[in-house]
Amino acid sequence: MIKKNFLIIQKLGFILFNRVRNRSENSRLAALNACSRVIFLPTRSGFTLIELLVVIAIIGVLIGILLPAVQQARETARRMQCGSNLRQLMLAMHSHESAQRQFPAGYLSDTSRSDRDSNTLDAAPGTGWGLLLAPYLEEAAVADNFAQVKDPSQGVLHPANRSLVAQQFQFFLCPSSAGDQEPFVVKDISGNPLADGIEIGRSNYVANAGHEEPWGIFPASASWDAIANGPFYRNSSIRNKSVTDGMSTTVFLGEHTSSLSEKAWAGVIPGGASHPTHKFATRIGTAADHAATLVLVHSGPAAAETALYGYEVIHPPNSPASHVCQMYSDHPGGANVANGDGSVRFVSEFINQDVWQYVSSIADGEVISSGAW
């Protein structure tokens, strides 16, 4: 009886064990099947909206950091090209001085003519320093074709010179200039076109006439010896030895952007004027100035301005006064200038005004070290 009961209990235990084992196996298989379903479920790729916004924000920050650096690098390259243009012009200046035993005149004018301009005594031919440098700028054809050789009575105004004086040359244009780069119609002081609307090529480079207004003081004088103290003026003929203040500390050429006023490379048309552009035309103190300012600028102080304002006025580069007869560039912070020795430097718009006055004259006796400006 006991043995029989033991067998029954043993059999029941075996059945129970098998059921538990089967349930465990089924659970294990179910778990594996669930994992398989999770592992092999198809997934979707792409950005969430938040991730996309983060990426856009990062790109915006990078652009904000890099763009000013890129723009600064471009301006640096343009400023270097501008300086290279000035060096090329100064090399031609010294070639002219070597060949002709003098630097070119600021512009040529026969002040003895009866048809001279009554305000400034300007008259033909009006040939400017830029045109006089043509043979030394690998533009000998321009000089050869200039009708002044054939008929000096009209010079720049000669009908045969219309296409010649309207040409544009890259070495007369600053790549940073924001103004027009096309030829412009020469107008009188009131804004009326001269000489049947003759056009003349632009220049972003001007010569330094010194302290005084290039067209003179009241009354205008045929001989400028008493008032001209810069290297270039009407019928000037200075040589290296004329610059007793030192060639390395005397400004010969500088910038004048066409976004301020009209400047020409070929020369002066008697009775014409340099007019401010629309950007500056309404600024106080800005007005058209007489023909000489088409190729020349001054630093001040000038007798005419002192008489007008009651005090001396200096015009450093990029001066807020924006005088059409001053050096002015579209470079941030200042302008390039070329010294008599051919060196080019960038002059700050915050240069000491007395220093700027001193480096603008050729023989005022002031000694300026290169580090002073």
PLM segments and residue spans:
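General helical secondary-structure elements
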Residues: 15-19, 24, 33, 40, ...
